[in-house]
């Protein structure tokens, strides 16, 4: 049950941040840097001291055997995307696909029956990510959106083997692939 709360918070904040990026564009870089610094400070303070509301929220958001760094990694991943990707729509979709897809993959994957032990994931979670990402991207990018959704779902599916928190790199990878759509489509047509 805790994981469902955690993923719901992840989903809501991710969607809000994605739309904030779309509205405020690159102006979010400085506030995001400040938020990351404050988040890191609060994280270390909460490890030593109880801070009302902040400690409770962090405890609600962290997994039982993890220390709750996911939100900080997510903010850093968004910052990397904002700095390195010029196309704001690509950054928006990178964050949105990750927030929705990752949350639904976890929520649905928890109850999944078809487990792939090697990856520590379920087929149902993979499909939840792929379908949600496809529904988000297809109206704007057509079949290329489905290609991006498939690549994104696969990367999320194997993320435990990568051993780097997917909050850090997946929003950037999705934004990068969308941003380089013309080059990738040309390469696919060439092959």
Curated annotation (Swiss-Prot):
Disulfide bonds: none annotated. Its main location: membrane. GO terms for molecular function: ATP-dependent diacylglycerol kinase activity. This is Uncharacterized protein MJ1137. One of its GO terms (cellular component) is plasma membrane. Keywords: Cell membrane, Membrane, Transmembrane, Transmembrane helix. It comes from Methanocaldococcus jannaschii (strain ATCC 43067 / DSM 2661 / JAL-1 / JCM 10045 / NBRC 100440). Signal peptide: none annotated. The keyword Membrane applies. InterPro entries: Dgk1-like. The chain crosses the membrane at residues 4-24, 26-46, 68-88, 90-110, 135-155, 168-188. It is found in: Cell membrane. It is a multi-pass membrane protein. It comes from the Archaea.
